[in-house]
Amino acid sequence: MQINILSGALGAEILNFKLNAITQNNFEELNSLLLEHKVIFFRDQNISSEELMSLGSLFGPVEEHAYVKGLNDFPQITRIVKAANEKNQWGEGWHSDVSYDVKPCKTIILRSIKIPPVGGDTVFSNMELAWETLDKDIKSIIENKNALHTSNGSKFFVEDFSEMESNGNIGEKYSNEHPIVRTHPETGNKILYVNPTYTKKIIGLPNKESDELLERIFRHQEKLDLSCRFKWTENAVAILDNRCTQHYAIADFYPGRGLGHERIMDRIAIVGDQPF
């Protein structure tokens, strides 16, 4: 096994490591890599859907997506498809997956199936480092406060992604409050747990003050020195700790630049704990 660090903030590409050979007996090595690097990448993984599910189940129960219908044989696997003529990219914009849930998923596994020849990278950001480097005046205000996280409903993907199908929860929206500074249940590290896609308000502050403070926090979270960037190739797998990272799928292969290509990914998510 060889470990190539991708940036000083987070991320590592793991070479000479076959994910379909992972069992409960050697899982701890994989989990230790994830806790250390927060997002880990593996190329040239000939891993089937059944093996992907087995891999995910080592981290915990695999959940179905709130809005998207999964594969017929594996409903917990969400197939993310951007057709060649579509502009939007699923996962565009900084976010932590399903932070609006009572128990947001703890781990996400992504598998690339079809990748555009140019563009389509994903950027990941370290929210433990974001907390460590946040201005002290902001820390003093938010350290013991909660924030409201609200989903956007399913309408956006029903309209924008023709190749993806709703599971029937068209009008459903979910809202939950979580600590702005959560604690990682495995490491004890502090995490800045808000994101511009789903976090709507700081509880206990007037709307104007909440909006202004969240905007300052979001600008801090977007700093490139908190991030790493991964260029996908087909049959690559990313495993990310959704508790302490955010990610952004870049939509830079739209036909307007002559780069209209299909992009297909599979996603599974592992049930998490209620943030504390």
Protein language model annotation of sequence segments:
Residues 1-237, 242-276:
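Non-heme Fe(II) oxygenase catalytic core, chiefly the N-lobe of the double-stranded beta-helix
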